[in-house]
Amino acid sequence: MTILSGKCLCGQVQLSVRGEPLRIGICHCTDCRQESGSAFTFFAIWPIKRFEHHGEIAEFDGRCLCPRCGARLFSFDDREAEIKLGILSEAPTPLTPTYELWVKRREDWLNPIEDAEQYEEDRW
C-alpha cells in the first residue's frame, strides 16, 4: 500500500496517508485563493481511517494549520481528510487532479487540466 507523508514548514506537524485518495482536485474559489495565498488549492481526499497526523495544530473555520509556522495543512471530519498536497514530501507528487472546482474564478492564464472534470462552482 502506498504511503505518502508530509510536514509543515517547521516540521512540528507531520502527517501521512495510506493508499489511493478518493478524489484529487484543484479549487479556484475565493476561500481557497485567500487561504492559500495563491491562484488555487491542490488537494486530495482520503478516508479518515487512512490519515494520521502528529503535532500540535490550530484550527480556523475547519482548516488545520501549524500554530508555530502557520502552514496550511488539512481539514477533516469523521469520514474524510482533505490534505493540501503541497505539503507532501515528494515533489512533484504522483497525483493528478481529476476535477477542478470554481473554474469561473480560474485565472485566464491558467489552462484547464486535461481530462479533468470542470465545475463552474462546487461539484454538487
What do these predicted ranges mean?
Residues 1-124:
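A short Gly-Trp-Pro
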